[in-house]
Amino acid sequence: MEKKHYGAIDGLRMIAAFGIVMMHMRANNNYEISGFVYNNVIPSFTNFVFLFMTVSAFGMCCGYYQKVLNNQISWSDFYGKRFKKILPFFCLLVLLDVAMSHSLGSIYEGFADLTLVFGFLPADTISVIGVGWFLGLIFVFYLIFPFFCVLIENKRRAWMAFGVSLIYNFICTSYFDVGRTNILYSACFFLAGGLIYLYREQIAHFNQWIVLGITCISIILYYVIGGYSVMCLLVSSVLLIYAILKAGGVLQNSCLLYTSPSPRDAHES
């Protein structure tokens, strides 16, 4: 089958990355600018991490879903590739942080960071490269990806798993007191990406203007209702669906494509 690349997803991912950088810059600067955009919109960019979860699951499915189900993948190569891609630069950041902290606790945490499996630790355990929690969560997703593919092997099972993940998201907040750093809390976003992958052929026939309208409405509702999980899930899903439909335009301009991360996993094999 000819490989298909969803180029607009690269642009969407890069816009989300810029948004998260803006959020961190606002949180750490020493000056104040009044206005709705500065006080409400930019802080909400922290929830772009949920879009990354949905896009990551979709991209992984494009690259590996069929290979996993057909037993056509070398897991040594799969995980080795991810260690080689993530660890060198992250290791440098961790070592610099440990050197600046120079405490026994930072050494323990640095060790956990360098294994890349610190996503299994309880929330708020790691302060060395504390913002790297998302990397830990994504690596947990990589580790359970074979099971993830089994969960979405067919649409019926995928919908059942998605329903269970929504319940988990609710009870994680209301009872277990864990948040987005936990894989069970965030599972619904990854499964949403998997479901969108399963329906990608049907989605290709959607009217992009109608989807754009739904996307705009969902973003407005997000700011009216609030950044609850269900709204983050809705916005992330419709943005991904629109990116699948959209070719060219602002999501696929040369500047964004040049600065976007490697799109290799977003090729459908």
What role is predicted for each listed range?
Residues 237-241:
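Generic alpha-helical transmembrane segments
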Residues 1-170, 258-261:
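Membrane-cytosol interface segments of multi-pass membrane proteins
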Residues 10, 53, 110-133, 144-236, ...:
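Aromatic-enriched alpha-helical transmembrane segments of multi-pass intramembrane proteins
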Residues 64, 68-69, 196, 244, ...:
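Hydrophobic residues in alpha-helical segments
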Residues 255-269:
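Residue-level detector of conserved catalytic or cofactor/ligand-binding positions
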